[in-house]
UniProtKB/Swiss-Prot annotation:
Membrane topology: Peripheral membrane protein
Family note: Belongs to the class I-like SAM-binding methyltransferase superfamily. MenG/UbiE family.
Keyword Transit peptide appears in the UniProt entry: yes
InterPro entries per the UniProt record, alphabetical: SAM-dependent_MTases_sf (IPR029063), UbiE/COQ5_MeTrFase (IPR004033), UbiE/COQ5_MeTrFase_CS (IPR023576)
Compartments where found: Mitochondrion inner membrane
Protein residues bound to S-adenosyl-L-methionine: 100, 155, 183-184
Gene from which this protein is expressed: COQ5
Taxonomy, superkingdom: Eukaryota
Name listed for the protein in its UniProt record: 2-methoxy-6-polyprenyl-1,4-benzoquinol methylase, mitochondrial
Organism: Gallus gallus
Transit peptide: 1-29
First-tier enzyme category under EC: transferase
SUPFAM superfamilies registered for this protein in UniProt: S-adenosyl-L-methionine-dependent methyltransferases
Reactions accelerated catalytically: a 2-methoxy-6-(all-trans-polyprenyl)benzene-1,4-diol + S-adenosyl-L-methionine = a 5-methoxy-2-methyl-3-(all-trans-polyprenyl)benzene-1,4-diol + S-adenosyl-L-homocysteine + H(+)
Gene Ontology BP terms: methylation; ubiquinone biosynthetic process
Amino acid sequence: MAAGLCPGRALLSRRGGALWALLGTARGRAAGPETHFGFQNVSEAERREKIYQVFENVAEKYDVMNDSMSLGIHRVWKDILVHKMNPSPGTLLVDVAGGTGDIAFRFLNYVRSVRERQLQQKLRHHQNLSWQEISKSYQEEKSNPLGDSQVVVCDINKEMLKAGKQKAQHLGYSEGLSWVLGNAEELHFDDDKFDVYTIAFGIRNVTRIDLALQEAYRVLKPGGRFLCLEFSHVSNPLLSRLYDLYSFQVIPVLGEVIAGDWKSYQYLVESIRRFPPQEELKAMIEDAGFLKVDYQNLNSGIVAIHSGFKL
């Protein structure tokens, strides 16, 4: 597979059991340590199952709800993430919890644009060539518009991947793009595989964030970059109160009206409030081994982009 999967660490057993294999649980296994699901206290096993069910329920309306909840601003946040990444042709990206492909599609657009600019600059430097030679060179370069860049979208939820694949087909994305069912806490990729690891609005839904960060570090090449876009903690007290009011009073209602699912969006709101603040997440990223870790608040900390390097 183009994703560079480890054959020795097969994701699913031949006899099935895909959901339990991915969630890291099995019938008969001890429930494990206690954690939280929104404001509820649950076992780790129960949390994994509940979160899987949330995204199974919302997958079909996920993109519509993102636009409705954020008034479309999530698109700007994702654009900022990809511009911060600044990928060049040849970059190999893994987008974990990539679901419906928003980051992957932006990555491919960005790389294609960079590649086109490079080609135009190259042709301007060869003005002494005949038009036949210029045309031949242009056609050869155009045959590889991504410059060997690839993005692997990895998500634990098959319904989210299904929605992403359908969107990719509708929008015409295929080259340089692959989809993998996988768990952020136990990625089935080789060590030192990727140039960039992204996770956008996904890490707060990971039960063991420490394990996910360790896996991110493992699969990145030396010099590789970790980028995380996530809802965070608002620094402005007035905005924080207004944000809480909107989150708890409006978002679940939108979930019910648009997706027919109040409970899933109530969880999503609660999960944001239970997520570690910016400095705490920064420390966790550093504990996983990353260096030069920093973060950028957007919209007064409604979301933050954390960045770190494997050096």
